[in-house]
């Protein structure tokens, strides 16, 4: 199996790589050719990561490739984990962040189209994750949109922690905890589908929405260890047999307009795994008027981001 991690010299990659190469994601019987991509200024740091990987003698590592070249990175891969993006700097407007990441994810989408297989699965983590996923998907038309996902699992894990710590829920009682909408401060946490059918207080929802910012304030940088753990759980779930009927939160392409939500967007929705690397959106859950309005507000943010990206794309084409 050939796995690409972009932003390979970054903090999330540093926490993720041991999980990938020790068999905790794809299983201990799966040998991995790991490709790490980063930009030229980070190449020396990438070489240091390479040294540490070799010194760790991970049991699942078959081959390691470090590179700054898109062709080398994306050629013939099975899984793309897209961590690399432009971070939001102080006082940076959203449109400026979108413009920076448009350039990156346009190039990554084009590389997927040109060098990767149509069967490749893609997980986008770099923010704005949902819209970055949309950009990459648009530029890789040979790869089905259902093969692209963005990360909502970290928000779901934060909700699970809240249910355990505040409501004394067991692990089993946190099943079907869900995240809806955009991966941003507008996301909507939902515990109504758990076995206890909990109705979250507004302060609980705000806690989930602000958790990432709270980590940055305390740690001085964004979530890395918990993000890597969420990536592990997303991929492990996606590769599952489909025997577990529990719902999970994936950022997926809303081709069919589920729940009346806008089409042609990557939205965090409830899914179940049907067989390895395939999922089905659960489209028959009952949503209250208040919850649906909150989700629609979050999705409107995605609509606005998409329209801004379309302007950027038009400028490139012109």
Regions found by a protein language model. Name each.
Residues 139-149, 154-318:
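C-terminal substrate-binding/catalytic lobe of Rossmann-fold NAD(P)-dependent dehydrogenases
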Residues 80-82, 124:
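Redox-cofactor binding/interface segments in oxidoreductases and associated redox assembly factors
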Residues 14:
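Residues forming the Rossmann-fold NAD(P)(H) cofactor-binding site
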Residues 84-87:
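Conserved NAD(P)H cofactor-binding loop of Rossmann-fold oxidoreductase domains
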Residues 25, 29-77, 307:
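Conserved N-terminal Rossmann-fold NAD(P) cofactor-binding segment
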Residues 5-9, 17:
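N-terminal Rossmann NAD(P)H-binding glycine-rich loop of SDR-like oxidoreductase domains
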Residues 93-161:
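Rossmann-like NAD(P)(H) cofactor-binding subdomain of soluble oxidoreductases
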């Amino acid at each position: 199996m050939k796995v690409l991690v972009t932003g390979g010299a970054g903090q999330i990659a540093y926490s993720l790589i041991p999980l990938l190469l020790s068999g905790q994601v794809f299983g201990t019987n799966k040998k991995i050719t790991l490709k790490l991509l980063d930009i030229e200024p980070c190449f020396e740091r990438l070489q240091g990561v390479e040294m540490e990987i070799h010194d760790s003698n991970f049991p699942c590592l078959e081959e390691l490739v470090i590179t700054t070249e898109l062709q080398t990175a994306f050629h013939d891969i099975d899984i793309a984990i897209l961590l690399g993006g432009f971070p939001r700097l102080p006082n940076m407007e959203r449109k400026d962040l979108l413009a920076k990441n448009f350039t990156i994810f346009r190039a990554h989408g084009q590389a997927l189209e040109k060098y990767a297989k149509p069967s490749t699965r893609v997980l986008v983590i770099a923010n704005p994750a949902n819209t970055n996923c949309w950009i990459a998907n648009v530029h890789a038309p040979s790869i089905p949109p259902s093969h692209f996902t963005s990360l909502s699992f970290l928000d779901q894990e934060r909700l699970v922690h809240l249910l355990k710590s505040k409501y004394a829920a067991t692990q089993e009682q946190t099943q079907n905890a869900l995240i809806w909408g955009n991966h941003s401060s507008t996301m909507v946490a939902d515990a109504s589908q758990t076995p206890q059918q909990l109705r979250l207080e507004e302060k609980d929802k705000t806690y989930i929405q602000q958790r990432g910012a709270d980590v940055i304030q305390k740690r001085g940088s964004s979530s890395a260890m918990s993000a890597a753990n969420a990536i592990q759980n997303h991929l492990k779930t996606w590769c599952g047999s489909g025997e577990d009927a529990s719902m999970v939160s994936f950022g997926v392409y809303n081709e069919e307009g589920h729940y009346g939500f806008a089409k042609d967007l990557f939205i965090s929705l409830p899914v179940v795994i049907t067989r390895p690397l395939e999922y089905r959106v659960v489209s028959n859950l009952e949503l209250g008027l208040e919850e649906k309005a909150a989700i629609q507000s979050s999705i409107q943010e995605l609509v606005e981001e998409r329209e801004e990206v379309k302007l950027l794309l038009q400028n490139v084409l012109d």
